Regions:
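Short, conserved beta-strand edge motifs with alternating hydrophobic and charged residues
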Residues: 77, 131-134, 157-161
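Cofactor-binding active-site loop characterized by glycine-rich and histidine/acidic residues
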Residues: 1-75, 88, 92-98, 112
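Active-site lining segments that contact anionic ligands and/or coordinate catalytic metals
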Residues: 153-157, 188
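Flexible, low-complexity linker and terminal segments
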Residues: 162-245
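Conserved thiamine diphosphate
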Residues: 41-42, 91-151
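Short, solvent-exposed amphipathic alpha-helical segments in soluble enzyme
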Residues: 63-66, 91-92, 147-151, 173-178
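Short gly/pro/ser/thr-enriched loop/turn and capping motifs at secondary-structure boundaries
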Residues: 80-85, 165-167
Length: 245
């Protein structure tokens, strides 16, 4: 949000706002919320927005503290699965086997060799009253979850899956299609965890092969059929673990 809203004349919002560093959004939001309480202003939900790098990596400590201290803040992570603003470097949210500028593809390395960090599960483990996932491909689901999260007292968290054209090596006209394919193939799941209770908010009528999603993106173009099959098995096992298939 800092990147897209700092150029003139796009800096004016109709709500009070603060531009801060990528990694301290949760810390600043915690301070704002505490300040409002000290002024006797109750019932105001503070909203913080951060990218995946600023959330799952360099801002994790601040976010963990925010949730643990029970600040009345809605934190939204916009996850495009790498540090896209600074040059497509991998983050803890980069999926297994994806190419980035810091996980190049060669004879030894086949892109990112670590699994994507499950940030919603980490926040749920903090016993936040509401945790949800969303996708830019399903805006009505996202809007519904934002309204719900804003109405709940205490720390709430929404993790939004957001394709990036340059970073994912896709044409911008395919952004929404790719976002939907992530959900339809099971590579990204839409759910809520409310007071520890898991609820899948969208289940594809019939899950499509992960190849449909992977082959649309240049960051996965190096994958062999065997490697794609391995990813498919991982997703199948994940769905069984969720108990939704």
């Amino acid at each position: 949000m800092e990147v897209v809203t700092t150029p003139y004349p796009e800096t004016a919002w109709r709500v009070p706002w603060i531009h801060v560093a990528f990694e301290n959004a949760a810390a600043v939001a915690s301070g704002v919320e505490a300040g409002l309480k000290s002024l006797g202003k109750r019932g105001i939900k503070v909203v913080a927005i951060g990218g995946d790098g600023g959330t799952v990596d360099i801002g994790l400590q601040a976010l963990s503290g925010m949730v643990e201290r029970n600040h009345n803040v809605l934190y939204i992570c916009t996850d495009n699965e790498a540090y896209m603003n600074t040059g497509i470097q991998r983050s803890g949210a980069t999926p297994y086997s994806a190419w980035t500028t810091t996980t190049p593809v060669g004879k030894v390395k086949r892109g990112e060799d670590l699994p994507k960090k499950d940030m919603p599960a980490i926040i749920a483990a903090h016993r936040a009253p509401y945790v949800a996932t969303a996708s830019v491909g399903y805006p009505l689901d996202f809007i519904k979850k934002v309204k719900k999260a804003a109405s709940i007292e205490g720390p709430t968290y929404i993790h939004v899956h957001c394709p990036c054209g340059p970073g994912w090596r896709i044409d911008s006209s395919n952004t929404i299609e790719v976002a939907k394919l992530a959900v339809l193939t099971g590579m990204w799941n839409l759910y809520e965890i409310e007071n520890g209770v898991f609820n899948l908010t969208f289940k594809p009528p019939k899950r499509r092969p992960v190849a449909d999603y992977l082959k649309m993106q240049g960051r996965f173009r190096h994958l062999t059929e065997e490697e794609i099959a391995k990813i498919q098995r991982t997703i199948d096992e994940q769905w069984k673990r969720f108990g939704i298939e």
